[in-house]
Amino acid sequence: MRYRRSTRHKRASATQLYQTCKASGTCPPDVIPKVEGTTIADQLLKYGSLGVFFGGLGIGTGAGSGGRAGYVPLSTRPPTSSITTSTIRPPVTVEPIGPLEPSIVSMIEETTFIESGAPAPSIPSATGFDVTTSANNTPAIINVTSIGESSVQSVSTHLNPTFTEPSIIQPPAPAEASGHVLFSSPTISTHTYEEIPMDTFVTSTDSSSVTSSTPIPGSRPTTRLGLYSRATQQVKVVDPAFMSSPQKLVTYNNPVFEGVDTDETIIFDRSQLLPAPDPDFLDIIALHRPALTSRRGTVRFSRLGNKATLRTRSGKQIGARVHYYHDISPIQPAEVQEDIELQPLLPQSVSPYTINDGLYDVYADSLQQPTFHLPSTLSTHNNTFTVPINSGIDFVYQPTMSIESGPDIPLPSLPTHTPFVPIAPTAPSTSIIVDGTDFILHPSYFLLRRRRKRFPYFFTDVRVAA
């Protein structure tokens, strides 16, 4: 059973005690002199200041900073700062913007109307000349009114393209004025723009292979939950209700937590000290969202919880961080020598043909190449030599009859005739004399290039002479 610890109450200040105990006369002995300023230190300063004058040195009960100007010699004057007065001007009148005026004020002035100057001279109507004639020879008097000269004025304005945006220039409206007046005025046109949809090309990249300070956006690496740190208490929960309704382990049947989403963080109100159904969940104020992890061969359901074991006078709560976990099922390791029966992916092809061995009534034996020991006699005008045929000469025998291994297996047919091979060469024969135990190499073979492991001119260990 837990007992509530007595709270520590702060003592009232001297001013608060003086306001309540002065009228009743129950004040402590050190409260009244401190508030009314009648302590020994206050008496010394009060009567000592009558005979001692320190001036503006700033020596007193305050901080020893020497006053605002600091400690300066007595023969000098402290520096004074000169205050400069500026001319007071009336404030600039800000004209308000009406509701129908545009919110963007253009930096280009609008069209300015320029007066044409002096009025155009009036030309009198052509009324002719007044001619007066007389009988005597007197000169004629002609009244001619002087006609003023017509004036031509040209006014133009130029814009600096550096400070103006490109715009569509439209012809100005015709001016109704007398005389010849040439003028130009800037025109303001509204900008038309087109909204072009932009596409963001997002490619996934590995965070370990990033070579620039601004990596390509993509999938971020998985952050560690920090469930098994030294500052986190590990608590194993056996009750399976921890996965479906964890609020039942923290509080008793409370309708406030009936419709709470258990996949998110659950906050509990701990304004009152109430016992928990499970003592492991005592003083829990928050259960964070769950996480499924695998550790040491098991599937684990985890939640982080915050406790409010202590609470300060300012209202701050202090508690431990607890990791609650529930092992769902173990992960069985796979056997090393486990035999897995495999099934064929494609159906086995069944041949529609069968071989009946009983139909074979003729058996073909393996043919052996015959070797004939027939003497071959060569006659020359000097000697007669007898050389056996099987001493290095190949003799091929081809049978004249056709051989088949069975009724269903045809063999290629062989020619029935025997090729003609002459026994004796048609070229003129030459006498060969074999005697002695050595040989003489022909001089033409000395200039041949030596080849590796090839000796075409070695016949025997006897001398050969033609």
From Swiss-Prot:
Residues 74-95, 203-224 are annotated as: Disordered. It is found in: Virion; Host nucleus; Host early endosome; Host Golgi apparatus. GO terms for molecular function: DNA binding; structural molecule activity. Highly phosphorylated. Its main location: virion. Pfam families: Late_protein_L2. Disulfide bonds join C21-C27. GO terms for cellular component: host cell; host cell endosome; host cell Golgi apparatus; host cell nucleus; viral capsid. GO terms for biological process: microtubule-dependent intracellular transport of viral material towards nucleus; symbiont entry into host cell; viral penetration into host nucleus. Keywords: Capsid protein, Cytoplasmic inwards viral transport, Disulfide bond, DNA-binding, Host endosome, Host Golgi apparatus, Host nucleus, Host-virus interaction, Late protein, Microtubular inwards viral transport, Phosphoprotein, Viral penetration into host nucleus, Virion, Virus entry into host cell. A motif (Nuclear localization signal) lies at residues 1-12, 447-455. It comes from the Viruses. HAMAP family: PPV_L2. Minor protein of the capsid that localizes along the inner surface of the virion, within the central cavities beneath the L1 pentamers. Plays a role in capsid stabilization through interaction with the major capsid protein L1. Once the virion enters the host cell, L2 escorts the genomic DNA into the nucleus by promoting escape from the endosomal compartments and traffic through the host Golgi network. Belongs to the papillomaviridae L2 protein family. Interacts with major capsid protein L1. Interacts with E2; this interaction inhibits E2 transcriptional activity but not the DNA replication function E2. Interacts with host GADD45GIP1. Interacts with host HSPA8; this interaction is required for L2 nuclear translocation. Interacts with host importins KPNB2 and KPNB3. Forms a complex with importin alpha2-beta1 heterodimers via interaction with the importin alpha2 adapter. Interacts with host DYNLT1; this interaction is essential for virus intracellular transport during entry. This is Minor capsid protein L2.
